[in-house]
Amino acid sequence: MLPSAQVARLKPDPFPPSLSPIPHGAVTFAALAPCHNLPIFSSRQMLRDSLTYSHTSPTMSPQIANRFEASLDAQDIARISLFTLESGVILRDVPVAYKSWGRMNVSRDNCVIVCHTLTSSAHVTSWWPTLFGQGRAFDTSRYFIICLNYLGSPFGSAGPCSPDPDAEGQRPYGAKFPRTTIRDDVRIHRQVLDRLGVRQIAAVVGASMGGMHTLEWAFFGPEYVRKIVPIATSCRQSGWCAAWFETQRQCIYDDPKYLDGEYDVDDQPVRGLETARKIANLTYKSKPAMDERFHMAPGVQAGRNISSQDAKKEINGTDSGNSHRAGQPIEAVSSYLRYQAQKFAASFDANCYIAMTLKFDTHDISRGRAGSIPEALAMITQPALIICARSDGLYSFDEHVEMGRSIPNSRLCVVDTNEGHDFFVMEADKVNDAVRGFLDQSLM
C-alpha cells in the first residue's frame, strides 16, 4: 500500500466490502502522500486564469442547428450573446447544449456535473446508464445532475456544424470555426450554471476528455467546487496521445472528399473519418482485451489456411466487406472495426472531430498557473477520487499516481481490468460503486 496521508481528513470509509483493498480485488484504493515544500498560491492566483471573462446572460432557445443534434432526444440550449475565447477570438450568439436530471435543492448546492467524453453528447444516460438511478452514483432523488456539451461538438454547442452568425445566410462555420480549449468549455459552462442559479457544485465527475474538464473545474476553488472525480485522464496532453490524434486527423485530411474542410455536411469525408475511428478504437482497448474478445488468447488457434477463393482476392481491401465468415477470429476483428467505424461516421462530423481532437493538445493544467504539473496539482485542495486502470494505454497508471501524490486530499482507485482505456464504460459497475461511495463519504 502507498502512504496513507490525508485519510484523516475524510469521514470513515463508506465503500462496500467488495471494494476493499484486497490483493486480487476488482478495485484497489490508496491514499497518496501529498507533495511538500511547494509555494502557496492565493485564491486570487488560483482563479485568475479561469475568471477573466465577462458575465453575459444566456437565453434559452429550442433551435436545432444540424442533423447530428437532431438525432438526439430533447435537450436544452443556452445562448450566450458574446464569449471571448482564450485565443482572444470573440464568438457571438453562442449556443451551449445541456441535459439535466433531478432538481436543485433550496440551497442550490446539490449540483453534480458530469463531463462527457470526446465523441459523446450531453445525454449521459445513453452512454453511462449504469451510474444513473436511485442508490447509484448519479441519484436524481438527491442530486441535480447536469452535463454540458463542449464547444466544437456536433451535438448542440457552437462548433463547425453550427450557424456562423457573421456569415452570409448564417451558413455553418465548417473548418473556419476557431480553435477552442478545455478552459474555454469550463468558463462558458460556468456562465450557463450561473444563469441556472447554481450556487455551489457538489462534485464534478468526468472520464478521459471529461477528466481533463474535471481537473479544470477544480481551479474555481473549493468554495465553488466541493470535490472532483477525474477518471482515466491526464493533467497535460502527452506526446504519445498527441501523435495518435494527429494520425487520426491526417486520415481525414487525406480523404479527397475533405476539400480543406469545405465539404457539404451531408457529404462527409466518410472514408477518412472511418479510418480515424478505427485507429481511435485501438487506442481505447488493450491487447489482452482484444485477444480475449476475438478468441486470440494464448493457446487459441486464431489463424486459418488461405483457401483458393481467398487467394484470388485483391489485397487492396475494396472487397473485404463481403469476405468475412462467422467464427473466424481474424475476420471478426476486421468486421468489428469496420462496423464501429461506419456507425460512428454516420453520427459525427469530420470538422468537429478535428476541432475536438485539437482541443486535447491545449490541455495543460499548469499553463499560466504554476511552473510544473505537481505545483498546479497541489493547488487543488478539494477531496479528489482519482480512478484509473493499469491497462489504460492512453493515460498511464504513472500519470494517475503523480496526480494522486500531488493533490493534497486525494485517493487513488485502481480498477483491476484488462479493458484498457475503455474500462470506465466496460467496468461501469465498479466505477459506479467507487463514485457512489466517494460522493456519500463527503456529501452526506
From Swiss-Prot:
UniProt keyword Transmembrane, yes or no: no
Chain positions listed as propeptide in the UniProt record: 1-71
Residue stretches making up the AB hydrolase-1 domain: 112-425
The keyword Protein transport belongs to this UniProt entry's keyword annotation: no
GO molecular function, one term: homoserine O-acetyltransferase activity
EC number: 2.3.1.175
Active site location: S208, H421
GO annotation, biological process: antibiotic biosynthetic process; homoserine metabolic process; methionine biosynthetic process
Gene3D superfamilies, per database record: alpha/beta hydrolase (3.40.50.1820)
Pathway participation: Antibiotic biosynthesis; cephalosporin C biosynthesis
UniProt keyword list: Acyltransferase, Antibiotic biosynthesis, Transferase
Reactions this protein catalyses: deacetylcephalosporin C + acetyl-CoA = cephalosporin C + CoA
Superkingdom classification of source: Eukaryota
Function: Catalyzes the conversion of deacetylcephalosporin C to cephalosporin C.
Subunit structure: Heterodimer of chain I and chain II.
Family, per entry: Belongs to the AB hydrolase superfamily. MetX family.
Protein name as it appears in the record: Acetyl-CoA--deacetylcephalosporin C acetyltransferase
GN (gene name): CEFG
